[in-house]
């Protein structure tokens, strides 16, 4: 009988104890005591079709150190906070990734998925609301971006009046040994004009009248190259590869696999899809201000996401700088 | 077999293995191949090059992050839409090499497979030729020494593992608690699997339920327990345990009470394994969702537990195990191969023993829960090795014997049509799983997984037709050819069909071994991480949570699979010859064995082609 009692006890432990232990572990009873001033937040990362971030909005108080425990529900995701200079973490399916973050100021932060996870990948964004000590969630009015300051319509077509037949080369432009006019040597001013306009400006200038069209284009390429730095191009390439290449393609031709679902012909018979940055006829017709505007605001209805809450201003300029490398040979 | 004949076979076998290929070598070229991954296939699914060629692999992904890990090469790439990967290698070795996804990409991730075929595919042609040589050799094998009536004589009579009545093993088996303890521990694992399946991550290869049921348990069952110990699993299976404890109103001890059950008798017309055949086929139709979705696995486990418990309250003994368990059916069939058996030492002792304690039970042991009277037990199939009879027998007449592999298959009597279909269904399923789950055809996997869609209905119909009509039809045709001369004798064909079906057992077990090697060696390493973090909740119980996926022996898998298949073929053809002699009343009758042997060879060649073919 003693054997039987022992057996009953063991069976009870297993039938009741095991589920209870699992429940207790889930409820955090075995977790180490939370560090003072630290808050643990559980987050589920699922593709947008599977629910996206759960929860989508997290509200915390300023001053708390946040330890986000992110469970991967389906495919590989990544977690990052927009406009914060913290490396993203990879969230693998069936595992838990940790991301530690102390919000520096009250306000709304956007967290987003950094790994292409679905055709709706870019919709996988959530909001972190950091409330100040006074209990207020500030909503600052940001400085309007350049395209708004200039009053540009970034949805208007920008077919270039002039565009190069061959890829312009900054090296060949350099070899001409000619000085650039002052307005084209100023990076700030260059952002407001298109390569097409710059070409027209040089073409009309008697100082360059002896040059052929290709040579003028080489000078345009030189001006564009001088408006950036190798570091910014590298930064821009990294951002482009992480966020843009899935649709626009690693080669910039608009042929990335993520863009296939976006390719369609509209009612007017115009085919739509991710922009092809190597197509000089359209690329040379836009200015950096327009392209930055498209990056910030996205293209309503075309599938182009808005990157305003995610990229810093510096990052948006870097990625636009990188886009020119598809038109010009630096 | 005469020595000369054996020598010829040996020389031929060595020849196909060692003779260098005579094909003219082609000049090595360079191939640039773009492989695009998308859930859950590679495009192209097959890369064909010649030996010595340089391959530049551009690996891209169209949907989510995927990997490409090439068997036999140190090559593991990762791609995401917008980030392609590139690798270069020289295809030094000929043969077929699978490549598989190395980044968890969704439910079917473990089955996302493509293949590199390096021509000339010597390994495949050598294996195929070896299969033919071994098949022909086994066909001529006449079973060695024969007794006067022409029946095959066992080399040695079965030898009990109990050397003396006081053997430690015997005393251990008579103890009740070790077996109970093991069952209870497995029940704990079972409950953990159900909890993990229902509450844990839905990512199959990170969930204890999927990894421990379909990789660890399955691999252990089909590769080790069944071929070497028959129904040993059944003796500690946790599924019928709660029902049996309720029936007995005791956990470990012998209560001496009447079984607590309505005590209904199982309908006579269901006292066979037709329900098990149907149950297995039903589950097999949903195999991809079942194998990849933890919640479905958990619900099926739970359903089996409830069914077993419920039935034990209505019917006497273990009706579920004997007549319903979808696993028990094939375990019992393949247990006939095991070199281990529970039998009585002397049937005369049982016949004259009036108490029949082994069947009705006494204070030392319960009556056989499996409806078996050990005194008339001749095959492993119905015996669950629970050892109650060994404990109950007051005359120490129940023993565990060691015996040659497949000893049960040599006897003619006792085989039934339901078992024939079990053998056919199991063989067909092993071939189909090798193609659907481990083959490079993404559309097939997608159709099998998209339950209740038109594509799945097509797959299900084809699956059922192959299982229930095509393969049985072809096998019946082969048997009919063997028995052509007595095609007008009523009932003869059916008897021969059932009798020849024994060849399906070594053949099917070999097919499942080949399939399971490909599943278990590749995915076994998931077990460590799943043990450390059974629910995918970020636990790290033994510090193993971050053990990466490491496929084992990938360069060797096709060879091991081919060895299993050719071994199974040799056993099946040898058995076909033995059955032909039985049918011919002991006369040498290799022509009678020929059609069925060709059937076995055909199935083996199909399987060889699936695992290593060009």
Labelled PLM ranges:
Chain A
Residues 35-65:
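N-terminal edge beta-strand
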Residues 117-118, 175-185, 203-207, 247-253, ...:
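Detector for the c-type heme attachment site
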Residues 61, 106, 162-182, 231-254, ...:
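Sequence/structural segment immediately N-terminal to covalent heme-attachment motifs in c-type
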Residues 55-58, 86-90, 99-101:
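Beta-strand-rich interaction surfaces with strong enrichment in secreted/lumenal proteins
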Residues 163-166, 180-216, 246, 262-290, ...:
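Electron-transfer interface patches adjacent to heme c in soluble/periplasmic c-type cytochromes
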Residues 8-10, 15-37, 92-165:
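Extracellular/periplasmic metallocenter environments
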Residues 207-232, 289-299, 308-330:
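C-terminal capping alpha-helices of c-type cytochrome domains
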Residues 136-178, 213-239:
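Electrostatic cytochrome c docking/interface patches
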